[in-house]
């Protein structure tokens, strides 16, 4: 549901990414999913309200394991342009670490990156009234090293968030 772009290797073949798993802007909706592409947020909020009136909860499918950034020879799109080393896991040569096969991985061991993720989640709950989330490659969210940590800082911070209580 987040604004996304087609991966360069798909573009070269004239193909599209219809699933949206190449996110560019976590606070923005993919306009092509809306009937009114100039006002997708209004349409989304109306949809959520209508679904709630029918007794249906809204669970968003979100991608916080990676972003649309590709190799460094490709254009900069999002977090790389803000602070590449803060937002992404990198090796000693500055290349992206790719534990998932997605090209890059958000560094959720970093305080700034975690805050950004939690701010995004808070936005969708408080502004759009969604009821929960499904996390793509969810175990990656618990990586503060190459290994999964069930007590990762992101999980602890999530549990302390006041908006989280609304989701229970």
Residue ranges and their predicted role:
Residues 1-129, 137-166:
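Substrate-binding/active-site clefts of carbohydrate-active enzymes
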């Amino acid at each position: 549901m987040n604004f996304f772009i087609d991966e360069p290797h798909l573009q070269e073949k004239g193909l599209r990414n219809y699933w949206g798993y190449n996110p560019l802007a976590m606070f923005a909706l993919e306009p092509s999913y809306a009937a009114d592409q100039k006002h997708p947020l209004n349409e989304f909020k109306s949809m959520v309200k209508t679904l709630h009136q029918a007794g249906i909860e809204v669970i968003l499918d979100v991608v916080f394991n990676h972003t649309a950034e590709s190799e460094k020879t490709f254009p900069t799109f999002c977090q790389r342009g803000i602070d590449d080393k803060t937002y992404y896991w990198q090796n000693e040569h500055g290349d992206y670490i790719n534990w998932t096969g997605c090209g890059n991985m958000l560094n959720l061991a970093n305080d700034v990156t975690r805050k950004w993720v939690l701010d995004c989640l808070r936005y969708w709950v408080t502004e759009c009234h969604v009821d929960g989330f499904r996390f793509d490659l969810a175990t990656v969210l618990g990586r503060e090293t190459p290994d999964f940590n069930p007590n990762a800082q992101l999980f602890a911070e999530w549990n302390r968030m006041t908006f989280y209580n609304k989701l229970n």
